[in-house]
Amino acid sequence: MPREIITCQVGQCGNQIGMEFWKQLCMEHGINPEGILEDFAVNGEDRKDVFFYQADDEHYVPRAVLIDLEPRVINGIQKSAYSSLYNPENIYIAKHGGGAGNNWGRGYTDAEKVQDEILEMIDREADGSDSLEGFVLTHSIAGGTGSGFGSYLLERLNDHYPKKLIQTYSVFPIENDVVVQPYNCLLSIKRLTLNADCVVVLDNNALTSIAVDRLKILQPTFSQINSIVSTVMAASTTTLRYPGYMNNDMVGLIASLVPTPRCHFLMTGYTPLSLDQKFTSVRKTTVLDVMRRLLQTKNIMVTGAVKKGAYMSILNVIQGDVDPTQVHKSLQRIRERKLANFIPWGPASIQVALSKKSPYIDSGHKVSGLMLANHTGIRSIFKVLYDQYRTFRKRDAYMNIFKQTKIFEDNLDEFDSSDEVVKSLIDEYAAAEKMDYINWGSDDDDMQFDPREPPKFSNIQ
């Protein structure tokens, strides 16, 4: 029985990458833009029901809720070839249509006002599932809607569905993308730390560099960057949709990657990468070649994160016609060459999940791979944003913008709380590099989490 996943797309960025994700899933499952299964895909062995359900006329509908405070992106989706794919009852656009003005406080406050309407959509989707496993949130943490509305939604999902998993695909910003983004990011990272079970970090700087350096695109567009993101998202869910013996549900994936509750921020790598699946610069793909490339810094989608620190866990999702003995030999070669540095207190091994490729897409290569990795160096991206926040906060820069919203009109306690959580997260990732990490925080009575506490998902396996 498939374990269903509901996708919540929040804000401009969240809906843009969500749209690309659904396009990719439709292609991989042989579903046309109107949700109708193509004749050639009728006898497929895939699990479409994880992300889609069938309407009364048997066309496929994404288990998705689309949310934005301004109409432009969702209106574009509704005017596209995929306009009839989505359930129109699951689309929310704010009546005022003015957006959140890149203000986390406005996004959060607006979400609080309409929470009943949003939760009704989500509850309806949940009630239509036979065995709901969890939720996926797509959003950016830099602007107002994805960060503020997304933060509020994370809190409510955690309260409303305490035993369901929450995974996010969170886009981290390019420098100076939004003037108040250090505030928005800090407030969002607190919620991602406390209310999500797994966060896939999508670093816009790294994605842009990959598009320029690897794909040779001089000035990448948002659409091209989002296409890279959708490739990663689709690959990270492939074992759920084309199940094998292992990692065929979300809980299995997350449990293999997240050893302690708060250290659940993942980085990704993908190879071979091409915006046109029929053309790629990699002439020959073997399991060893793919697995070696996944460990190269230039292929990792978080800037500079693996230059220092150590891996806590690695899961490689290998797609294609693969001989398991080649996987074993490749792992042995990587171990001999010490291509991956692991933390001293855990298993120093790369986990591998083998998955089928969609038979409906001619990818032009035999083997492809996605790396999902938990690495202590991820703290570098938090440290940059945290330092920017501290610089702003010392000067009280732009703080009047936030004081105009309900959550900050009386005090700034929420900033202080977020500061504490993010600083602790940075410290914990640094501590995880040392052998005595299992005792980390044991003398601190105020710690909200004990690193030895089992993650939420371990209770529902």
Swiss-Prot record:
Molecular function via GO: GTP binding
Location(s) in or outside the cell: Cytoplasm, Cytoskeleton, Microtubule organizing center, Centrosome
This protein's record includes keyword Cell inner membrane: no
Pfam families with a match to the protein in the record: Tubulin, Tubulin_C
GO BP terms in the entry: cytoplasmic microtubule organization; microtubule nucleation
Binding site for GTP: 142-148
One annotated Gene Ontology cellular component of this protein: centrosome
Swiss-Prot/TrEMBL keywords: Cytoplasm, Cytoskeleton, GTP-binding, Microtubule, Nucleotide-binding
Superkingdom, natural source: Eukaryota
SMART domains assigned: Tubulin (SM00864), Tubulin_C (SM00865)
Similarity comment: Belongs to the tubulin family.
Function in brief: Tubulin is the major constituent of microtubules. The gamma chain is found at microtubule organizing centers (MTOC) such as the spindle poles or the centrosome, suggesting that it is involved in the minus-end nucleation of microtubule assembly.
Protein name, as recorded: Tubulin gamma-2 chain
